[in-house]
């Protein structure tokens, strides 16, 4: 009998020094495996849109309305009303969105998970979600957490006398953190030392000015108490959420019409955040040692500010007070910089002591709306036009909470607004007769006879579809915005060549009378793939689903769509210029935005190289003597040990190991598939002697996925 070990068991799965610890620059390919079926308890057959249709929507709203004034002893409601804290919860769920990469936002219920559930700016929002649990429990999977967080904010506003613009459901929960989101490089909460360059220029794609903040420091830059200096940070942060000056003013003032900030005592009284709290805290954090730890003793932001005389009712008090009083810099009980109205009467109600009144108070960033000349103009207009302010806030709130949901076709529920908004990237209704199989076959034959090459057909379809971003559901082939500004002029799309291809395809489209140009572009790409597969000896039909429409220039916000321009697209071996991030990492970033797995990314890169889809006709990575033929030659030749690689003039030269004769040139992206152990393992599958047929079928499957990423009508 084996002797029982006397050694303690000190190791668990996943513990110890990781590969990432040893090699910090290693490709993060695990980011392409996020949110797989293995992490989803609801199973592959679960259809959230169908479940949402079964929801008694107005009964849910009634329950939420009742919750607003059902104060609980364990977390008493300020002013007897939970509305303000639920507005903050919804705001902070949606407010992580940024335009640069479409990541963040409230569309996946990420506020439940680290790091967001433990950000300093989200202090005590964990209590709001716990207050919601009985309602979530009651309605189960017919309402996602992602939808519930936003809907609760809407109901909170309505319960306080505000008329919202509407609400759309359709946000499907995920079950683990979005580890692909880069929140910054700082390792200390509220730090700023690694996100600015030059004259306080915030690095892309970041939007928040501090690690762990949703927006900006409410005490001003570096807690300076300078409201004018705060204007730059405010514009940068809100601007990266696609908000203009009017929307910024409306959101700040509208949000601060309700509730209060909490700073009853120094922050040293706060316990650890949820992710750092002990097991017995059961996911709640920031337990306070000051007084009762809640109610009048609450410590959250460290600021102790109440803006209006009716903190649980919509009013125009914010602007009335902003301009009526003169303000002096003071400190909260926690020592934070804030502003108190000079010589003002005590007109502000205390949140928990009946009859007690306080002087009006403001944040440094509130006063920015008065001292910044452009913000002041808007603020005075809203002061004189309360209805205009209410409408602006309603629209800005709807945009804030729906910006990451993608096109309107994804919206669910009885309160979806009828009005079409430019930021929704609207599409016209379909007006063409639906083509049948014979129509499709006829058009495919004409495309094949058009004189356009495989490379032209494939590159154009890829340029159209690959703008898609899985975060905010923007981009994609539907709309044929490839022919419109700004996309038609993007360097990655080789504008001169693109114009010629589009002209030919548009001629075929108009002659057909049954297809949108968006459909023709995708169909033409499929024709190119089929031709290339046939030349490789594999007969295959690329799936095609008509039904796309063509957007107009008027339906396309040029400034907003500019964020979709690729800085790098490793699938086309395109890189706009040198940067601090190795381009192979940017390939993974692009693949993650396209919701691709590592095998899908691999087969697409290998296929696009041999099909000649590189931007500008570059020959880098075209490891084949048969361009335009869908072979696994990219992988076969990359893994060939008869070739040796050396860096040369910003790229790499592949030379015959014996003769020294140059055979190929490559980028870092190309060589990653031989250098990275995981990618090499995938490449070996296609480079094997039996890899040809599998390669073609896998390429067509991944290609079709990308072409249909924005086809929510097919789901």
From Swiss-Prot:
Instruction: Give EC number(s), comma-separated.
Output: 1.11.1.21
Q: Does the keyword Metal-binding apply?
A: yes
Per its record, what are the GO molecular function terms? catalase activity; heme binding; metal ion binding
GO cellular-component terms in the record? Answer: cytosol
Annotated catalytic residues: 92 (proton acceptor)
Q: What does this protein do?
A: Bifunctional enzyme with both catalase and broad-spectrum peroxidase activity.
Q: What is this protein called?
A: Catalase-peroxidase
- Name the species this protein comes from: Methylibium petroleiphilum (strain ATCC BAA-1232 / LMG 22953 / PM1)
Q: What taxonomic lineage is listed for the species of origin?
A: Bacteria, Pseudomonadati, Pseudomonadota, Betaproteobacteria, Burkholderiales
Q: What is the gene called?
A: katG
